[in-house]
Amino acid sequence: MPLTPEPPSGRVEGPPAWEAAPWPSLPCGPCIPIMLVLATLAALFILTTAVLAERLFRRALRPDPSHRAPTLVWRPGGELWIEPMGTARERSEDWYGSAVPLLTDRAPEPPTQVGTLEARATAPPAPSAPNSAPSNLGPQTVLEVPARSTFWGPQPWEGRPPATGLVSWAEPEQRPEASVQFGSPQARRQRPGSPDPEWGLQPRVTLEQISAFWKREGRTSVGF
């Protein structure tokens, strides 16, 4: 029977485990260009921020004369006022944001008539002042025509003399002048104690008409 060599007695030290299984090599070839691009972008952003901050601080140290702070002035009486800056025209343009100056040295031109051709054709002509020859009789007085009412209509009992026993809901109107044609509304006048004018639209009835109405209705009193 052949003899086999026995292992030596005692602990045998071998190589460590990390040396037995070495790390695989990483492919770092594409990483280098990517990191260079990121570093370039970061440097560009940092440079832009520094330039903008430098310009901002320089402008803050040298303020614009057109946008200076308002001047405070003490007026008599212990009042603190803000002194206006610039001229009145500049202030108006800055306030309203208008490109056209709002304060002009000449009178504004009359607005031109704007509209369609049909509207201008159907529009009534503008009234022209009549060229009357001067007369030596003195200034002529213009007769004032009373205001016309839309809902006015001639009543059958208007125009006759007031009879006894009339019950009127309004005071009798004044007689129209001779120049006013018959059938035109009478001039309105102020009601005593009231700011509203009296238009003369209230109906006027007589006692006989009221009695005839109730007789026709077959009643002598109103019941609820």
Curated annotation (Swiss-Prot):
UniProt keyword Glycoprotein present: yes
Sugar-bearing residue positions: 4
InterPro entries documented for this protein: DUF4689
Residues found modified as Phosphoserine: 194
Phosphothreonine modification, residue list: 112, 116
GO cellular component: membrane
Location of this chain's protein in the cell: Membrane
Superkingdom in the source lineage: Eukaryota
Chief subcellular location: membrane
Disordered: annotated segments: 104-138, 152-203
Post-translational modification: O-glycosylated with core 1 or possibly core 8 glycans.
Keyword Glycoprotein: yes
Transmembrane feature ranges: 32-52
Membrane topology: Single-pass membrane protein
Keywords of the record: Glycoprotein, Membrane, Phosphoprotein, Transmembrane, Transmembrane helix
Name of the protein in question: Transmembrane protein C16orf54
Gene name in the database record: C16orf54
